[in-house]
Every structure is written in C-alpha cells, then in structure tokens.
Amino acid sequence: MACMVMLFLHFWQQKARRACVSLHSGYRDIPESCIPGFAMQELLSGQDCMAFLSGQSPQGFSQDIKIRRVDMKKIRVYIGKYWLAYIAAIACMAAAIVLDMLYPKITQSIVDDVIIGGRQQLLTKLLAGIAAVGAGRCVFGYLKEYAFDVLASNIGSQIRKDLFAHIQTLSARYFDSANTGELMARVKDDVDKIWNALGFVGMLVIEVVLHVSLVLYCMFAISWKLALVPLAAMAFCGSLAVFMERRLDTVYEDISEENAVLTTIAEENLAGVRTVKAFAREKYEIEKFLSHNKRYYDLNMTQSKIMVRFYPYFQFVGKALPVTMAVLGGISVIRGSLTLGALVAFIEYSRNCTWPMEMMGWLTNDLSAAAASYKKIRTIFEEEAEIRDREDAVLLDHVRGSVAFEGVSFALDGKQILKEIDFQIEPGKTLGIMGATGSGKSSLIHLLQRFYDADGGTVRLDGMDVRDLTLAQLRSSINVVLQDVFLFSDTIEENIKMGKRTELGMHEIRTAARRAQADGFIERMDEQYQTVIGERGVGLSGGQKQRISIARALAKQSPVLVMDDSTSALDMETEQEIQKMLHKLKNTTKIIIAHRISAVCHADEVLYLENGCIAERGTHQELMQKKGLYYHTFQAQYGAFAGQKETDAGHMAE
C-alpha cells in the first residue's frame, strides 16, 4: 500500500506541483462540440475574426479566472463539484474489493472444514456464499466502473472547456507567437491524457491501493512472517516504478512537444494545400512531415524500450510471488504452523497481489504521459491577458462613433510601428488611410480595438480613452472587415448572422447581402443562403468571400465600420457600388484602409502613412494639389489615364 501511495503522490505532487486552475462555473455552458476536431481548429485559427465580430469581449471570461498555485493533491478544485459521486464510487469499489477478499476465506473453510474436517453440511452454505459474493461483486463492480467513467467524462470535459475558455481570454500578443497546431494538441491530446489519468488510471490507482491494503491485512492476519515476502515484493516494484518514471519523464515531454509540431505541420499544410500545389512543393512538404514523423516515431520507440526494459521485472515478481508463497507456505504446513486451508487462502491472496504489481509498469507509463501533458497545459493556464478591463471601466449609454488618436506611438517586439499619430473623425464621417505595406495602417485598428495598448498618447472613442471602456462595448462598437477573410464551415446564412448576436431574420440577411453586392452569386447557388461553404470559404473566389464578409459587417450595424483593404479582390464596378453604399451610411463612422486610390478618394479626409508617421493628410483634391506621395501613387495606378481618373475622382468625392 505504501508503495502505491508513494507512486501516486510522486506523479501528482512532484511532477505537477505548482498550478491548479479554478474557473467560474459560467464556462461550463460552452458546448463540448466546439472543442474537438475542425471546430476547435477553426476557432483557434480565427481568433482575430472572433474578436472583430464578437459582441461580447473575451475579457468577460478572464475576470473570473484565478490561477492558484497549490499542490496538485488539491485537485479537488475540479473534483469538488462531484465529491459525493466520488465517495459513492470509492464506496462501491471498496465493497467490491471486500467481497473479493471473501473468496480465499471461503476456500480456506472448504479445505479445512469440509474436505479435511468432514463437515459436508457446510458445503451448501459455502457454495451459496460464493454465489452471493459473486453477484454482489458484479453489482458493485458495475457501479464502480460506471461512476468513474461518468466522473472522468465530466472532469475531462470541464478541463477542456476551461482551457479553451482561458485561451479565448488571452491577448493578441500571445497569439503572435503561439501557433494553432500546438494549441490544438494541448486542448485535445494533452487534455485526453489528463482525462485518462483522472479517470480510468486514477480509478486503478485507488483500486490498487485499497486492494493491496486489504490483501496485506488478510495476509498478516494469517501469518505475519509469510506476509513480509509480498510486502517486500511490493516495495521492490514501487521503487522500480519510481526509477522507471524518472527515465520516462523527459521522453514524454519530448513526445508531447513533437506531437504539437506534427499537428502544426499537418494543420498548416492542409490549410495551405493549394499554395503547396501551386508551387509544386509537395515533395518538400512530405519530406518535412516525414522528418518530424521519424523523430516522433523514435521518441515513441525510446518510450517503448524503457517499458520493455522494466516491464519484465514487474511480471516476473508477480508470477514468482504465488510460487514462492506455495513453497514457503508448504514448509509451514509441514511444520504444523499453518493449516492447509490457510495455505490455500494465502496463495490466493498472493495471486491478488500479482495484478497490482504487473500494473505498476503500465500505470507508471500513463501517469508519466499525463504529468508531461499537464506541464504543457499548465503553461497556458499561467498565461495572463495583457489587455483587460479596468476595475472602474465605463459603460457608455450610447456610442456615437467619434474616433480620435492623440499623439499615439506604438512599438511591437522592439520595433517602432507608429510615431506621434494625431487625427480625429466625427460621427458619420469617412477617413481614408493609405500607405505602403508595413507603414502601420492595420496597427491603428489594432490599437482602436485594444488588441494592444499604445505606448504613448491616447486613443479615444466618443471622447473616452479606450482603456477606460469595457472591452465588450468597445469591440462590439467597432466592426472590421479584413482583407484576409475568415469564413467558417457553415451555411452562408450563419456566416452572415455571426456578425450580430441577436437573431436576424432572412429579410435582414438578404438586405445585408444585397448591399454588399453578394446576393447575385448567392442566389445562383442551388441551396442559396443554406449553401454550406467549405473550411475558410474554400470553393468561393476571393471577391465572393470579401462580399460575404462585408455583408456580415453590415448586418452587425456597429457605430464604427473599418474596411481594411477589404475590396482588394473586387472588380472596379463592384467596388464602386460598395463605395456608393458606404457613402449612404450617414450614421456610421467609416475608416477605409486601402492601397487603391478609388477606395479612399471619396473620404472626408485621407491620411498617407510612411514609416509609421503621417506623411500627408487632406482631402483627395488637396493631396493631389500637393503632388506628394498620394499624387505619385495616383499617377502610378492610373498612368496615361491619370488625368481622366482625377476628374472622375473629383466628381466622386463631391
């Protein structure tokens, strides 16, 4: 018993000591179906999309999350809700084990009293006792198995939900370095291993401890001298298991890490399979995958070799123990210090010690895997969101949509992105932003939505510092349409409805699609709005995906609308129609980020960024008269037709 307790505590105290997570019960409402497989992959891959569209800030989760640095033996943080069920399950297990202990005693009575003593009238009662014990053992065994299966499912599901919910609270800076494949491995594979350890393996550990305790008690009751032999055997196996775990610890950490790498490679390759084929890189991708797959194979073979090296010792001790007991017990019978029935019972008890000793190697293996997985998961739980609501965060009664940047500077990973940015947009007005790639255009929107906080200066919405507003209200007030559209594997209707939390009717959905110039191609499809689009919108053209994304934004009807180069894949005619539609949104503040002059020439003011600074600002006509960067961009885009286009753009701006 002492050896098994030592084994269990060694893994869950020493290997997973420092963190345990307590989460608000509200996370239990997250459907389990949102976690595994492609759904989890889409949600993790679409973090930006979720933040842009969500009417509720992810920070709504993080305020309820507390990371407690406690010993892992206080895992009752998770099992606390089910403590009565655990007690009932352990009680059923104990009852089944007690009944198991009766078999050898009945056998002893049959040998000593019936066979040797000649009391044949006891045989019927003893056989009835065997039947009753067997029936009771079946009932309690079934209840034990069922209870632990249910508990493991509930706790494993809760851990997975809590981990996924915690990931949703993390700031954008975390996802700058994290990758989807690794997070998928943590949420799915690593949680499965912990689930197994807290469920089936945990049940076996408890069962082994109780079983061995009662067996040793019964053995000592028969002969304390003979009982020292199985006690020594258990001590030997326990020490061997601890030594084996130390060898497995590093291996399982490497296996967990390599599994995440393999998942990342597979996820990235499948997501970008068209790019791979376009560049004829299939051979390179196969070789890259095979290289990591070989390392994964080698690590698993190392783990197997360790198991193979140690496992025979557990088996040998388990098989040799009954034989040893038969020999030593036989000597005691010959000397008259032990009855034959007691010897038979003792041998049966020694056989009951066999399977726990043989299981030690297997339990060590699974607990080592779970400990390594827990370390990986713990690092995610210990991550804290950099961006969070202040305790005195303000909730505005009504958001009008005025936006202001006052001396804003921002650096990321030591690189200066924005320097002293100043501008203001009144509600309902339109601001155009142009500049070369990497000039800081998109960073302005990240700061406006508080994906990051500015290093200097102030970003304001309706005159309020965005850091003083709740993230939920701030992000639900700003709708962003990205150039890189993220669509989910669902119907077109559901992809459009995603932008608004309240239920939308088909009339509103069709209206949004019509205004986004998407109704034409949608209604030509066989299933129209019920058409299920593939992962990330596969099967749709870039322009079609952008139009669905614009429809989703229009359905949301936020006070501030940001178009981040979101018409780049549209033809000129469709783009002009959308520009006309945007011009009619008098109650919506519009920020249009683009590379094409045609997308911003109608704006009330245009900013031209260069190296993180505002190099030029003004209306289209004013910037053309300056003959600076904006003017040269116009000339480069329209060439010989620049004169005519300038006239057309002037009319359009008016």
Residue map of PLM features:
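An intracellular "coupling" helix at the cytosolic face of ABC transporter transmembrane type-1 domains
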Residues: 172-173, 189-198, 202, 206, ...
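Short intracellular "coupling" helices and adjacent cytoplasmic loop segments at the cytosolic face
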Residues: 116-117, 153, 161-185, 189-191, ...
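Transmembrane helices of ABC transporter permease
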Residues: 81, 85-98, 102, 128, ...
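Helix-loop-helix
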Residues: 119, 218-232, 302-375, 380-381
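ABC-type nucleotide-binding domain
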Residues: 63-66, 389, 396-654
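Membrane-integrated ABC transporters
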Residues: 1-18, 23-100, 107, 115-127, ...
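Alpha-helical transmembrane segments
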Residues: 96, 100-104, 132-152, 233-248, ...
